[in-house]
Every structure is written in structure tokens, then in C-alpha cells.
Amino acid sequence: MSVSKKPMVLVILDGYGYREEQQDNAILNAKTPVMDALWAKRPHTLIDASGLEVGLPDRQMGNSEVGHVNLGAGRIVYQDLTRLDVEIKERTFFANPVLTNAVDQAKNAGKAVHIMGLLSAGGVHSHEDHIMAMVELAAERGAEKIYLHAFLDGRDTPPRSAEASLKKFEDKFAALGKGRVASIVGRYYAMDRDNRWDRVEKAYDLMTLAQGEFQADTAVAGLQAAYARDENDEFVKATVIRAEGQADAAMEDGDTLIFMNFRADRAREITRAFVNADFDGFARKKVVNLNFVMLTEYAADIKTAVAYPPASLANTFGEWMAKNDKTQLRISETEKYAHVTFFFNGGVEEPFAGEERILINSPKVATYDLQPEMSSAELTEKLVAAIESGKYDTIICNYPNGDMVGHTGVMEAAIKAVEALDNCIEQVTKAVESVGGQLLITADHGNAEQMRDPATGQAHTAHTNLPVPLIYVGEKNVKAVEGGKLSDIAPTMLSLMGMEIPQEMTGKPLFIVE
């Protein structure tokens, strides 16, 4: 008979943040003798679950998807926007080999560097700060002919807000003494995603042929003329920017073209028009042999250089368990099942070898304030049985209540949800201790600890950017480390299990065995 395993259990209390003020705090207003006792008597610490510490922009509230990716990855997983912000701030962007090679190639051949993208501070498809950094990179590396083809936003920004952005770039080029804005066009044309090729063709001709419906001496003048025609930013018609005596910025063979959008869906069509030999969306009047760079991978089947390929997450916690022949269980209700499986595994859908999954159906109610305990009793019953079975080396469980009931904004219901969880934690703790296992209790982000918005007085239904608790229950004598974050959890579990931590995990163990 096989030896019974003593499992390492991770319980994620979704939306269970830490806030010391009792006002509007469902967690502190609930009766939680079990969690209170654990916090008082067991090794514990607070960890960050929002902002830069989980790869989001500074001070942005955490969310369940990002939280579970970080929990399972054992490293901060940056979103593209934040990844680029960090790269630019730390100046690694300016040494990106794909970008520098593309610029150097054009410069050394006396060719132009064309930069295109959505000139916007919206941060959804692109960010103008990234485009500015690209202009600086090209200038610093000695490129003389730098042409910016600006797609105008007005969807993720106010409808008429492009003027300040265009002026900023015209001032920049003036200060550099080289380069210019060569064209402007609304995203309606340049960033279609529904195969409306007649629109894309107008943007393509504007850039390749330097031909448009309109022409202006400066980008700001071109924009003002569009406003006079009653075109908002998004719908600005193809406008060539060229003052008297300026060389035309049509694209030529051997030029470099760098597309600075980081979001793929609206970047694919125009990229295919430039890159695909067998392109048939429209008959191209001019096919240019360009050195084309995508900022991120817009599609796996677009064969051209990528400055920032997708970060594949090697050796996440789940994969590392499988490589070490360990058994693991993932268990949650419907609402958070994807989070303890797909997201915790770094975006991998298929279970790893030795990974089992249990899905408990969430109750069929209109809103969860009507049943704040949700399916926690059944979930706990199955979880306790799994702990006592001796089958699993590790178990990952998510209780959705704090988040799903927190989102309703109903304080009384959120209090009931937290009280139901306390009862569950009591049973789980007893089960873990009875088999000599170890338990970590934490959260992926806050929610239930702030049920009213102090600024508006309205119900607060969103997540928070507050820290979350981390508690250790087990037989080991451990000391807690301060200053942790979600990406420290996987290394913490491995260290408590006495396992090696893979080098890809840059997080640090938060409980040190004394």
C-alpha cells in the first residue's frame, strides 16, 4: 500500500483583503473566531496583491485573473502595458535587439525608419509614451529619416483629444532637429478588425504612397481641418502631412517600419497588408519590401520580427509539480474554477500529469447576496475528504464568497459570506492538522473589506488595492518574512515542501523554517 501523503494545501479566499478600519468592512464586522485565532497565534504576514507588485500599472487594483497567474507563476507576470513601461523606465527598451537592429539596418543603408501606431494615452491598444520612446531610440541611434504615421484614437480617449498628443510629437521632432509626423488617420481606417478592407486600404495607401484625401503642412493643422469637416479623432480621413520643400515620406524597399501597438486584435489586418506575400484583402497599389517589426506578437501566423514575444511561463507551480512526479488537486466552485486551473497554470488549459480537478457548481441565484454562503459547505466537504485521502502532495482551493458577494455591494450579505468562510476554515484546518499536512491561507486581491466608497457614499462593488493576509498552519517552526507579494506564494509552498525552486521563479519564500 502506498504511503499516505501529507498535503501542502493552499486556500485562496477570493476578495478577502486586509484593512484595519472597521467602518464598511465586512470582514471586521463579521464574527470570525477561527481566523482571529489563526491570526493571533500562527505565523502570518501581509502581502501585496495589486499594482506593480502583480504586473499591473502602479496603484491599480488587483483582479482574480492576474492574481492567480502570479500565485502560480512564482514571478511577477507583467501585462504588456506595464512590461513596456518598466522596460522604458529601466532603459532596457533602448537595448531591445529587435528594435535596435531594425533601426541600425535602415540607418546604415541610408533608409527611413517609419513608426506607426495609435497615438493615445488610452493605454488600451498602445501608449504614446511608448511611441515617444521609439522616436528617441531611433534618434539616439543616428537615424536621420524618422517618419511617424499617427493613428488617432477618440475611443479610449475623449472624441477630440489628439491635438495635445500631436503637438507633443511635433515639438519633439523640432527639438531633435530631424524626423516629422508624416501622416494622420483615424483608427476607424487603420485599426479595423472586421475585414472592412476598403478602410484599411486608405490607411495603407496613405503610408506606402504618401497619398491621402487631404494634405496639411503640420499634423495639428491637419487635425484642425478634420475637426472643421466634423471628423472626430477616430474618423479623421487619410491626411498627408508635408510642408513645402519637405521630402515625401512614401515607403520604399529597404525601409524599416515599426508598429508600436501592443494589443493584437486591431493590429492584425494592417500588418497582414504589409507583411503577407499572398495578401488578398485588397489589390495593393504598391507592395513594399520592408523590415517590419511588430511590438508584440499579433498572430502566430504573421511571419515577421517581434520585439516582445509572448512571455511563455515555463515551470509554473503546476508544471514543476508534474516534473517532480507529484500529485495535485485543484478545487473550486464554478465562479473561480478557471482561476485555480487555467490561470494558476499560466494560461495552460490541459491538466498536467498527476493533476486532478474537482468542480463544485455555484448556486443558481440571480445575485450571490441571496445565498452568501454559496456552495462553500459542499466545497469544504470535498476538500476535507481530499486532504484526508492521502492521495495528493498539494491541493489548491479557491473560496469565491468574499469576492462574489463583495461585488453585490450588500454589506449584510458580505458579512454572512465571511462568517460562512470562517466555519469552512475551521474544518479545513482540523483536517490538515489531523494528517500532519501544511496549510497556507491567503487571498488573490481585496474586496469585502471595503463595502462602501468613502468618496461617494455609494456601495463599493469593485476590488481594492489593499494587501491580503497570509497565514501558515503546520508542524514546522517557521518565521514570517515581511514585504511579500502574490508571486512569492509558489516558492513559499515549494520551500515548505522541501523542494527545489526552479530558477524561473524569482519570488522568495515568505516562511523560513527555523
Swiss-Prot record:
The active site is at residue 64. One of its GO terms (biological process) is carbohydrate metabolic process. Mn(2+) 1 binds at residues 403, 407, 463. Pathway: Carbohydrate degradation; glycolysis; pyruvate from D-glyceraldehyde 3-phosphate: step 3/5. InterPro entries: Alkaline_phosphatase_core_sf, BPG-indep_PGM_N, Metalloenzyme, PGAM_B_sf, Pgm_bpd_ind. Its EC number is 5.4.2.12. GO terms for cellular component: cytosol. Gene3D superfamilies: Alkaline Phosphatase, subunit A (3.40.720.10), BPG-independent phosphoglycerate mutase, domain B (3.40.1450.10). It comes from the Bacteria. Keywords: Glycolysis, Isomerase, Manganese, Metal-binding. One of its GO terms (molecular function) is manganese ion binding. Mn(2+) 2 binds at residues 14, 64, 444-445. It catalyses: (2R)-2-phosphoglycerate = (2R)-3-phosphoglycerate. Its cofactor is Mn(2+). Substrate binds at residues 125, 155-156, 187, 193, 263-266, 336. Binds 2 manganese ions per subunit. Signal peptide: none annotated. Catalyzes the interconversion of 2-phosphoglycerate and 3-phosphoglycerate. Belongs to the BPG-independent phosphoglycerate mutase family. Monomer. This is 2,3-bisphosphoglycerate-independent phosphoglycerate mutase. The gene is gpmI.
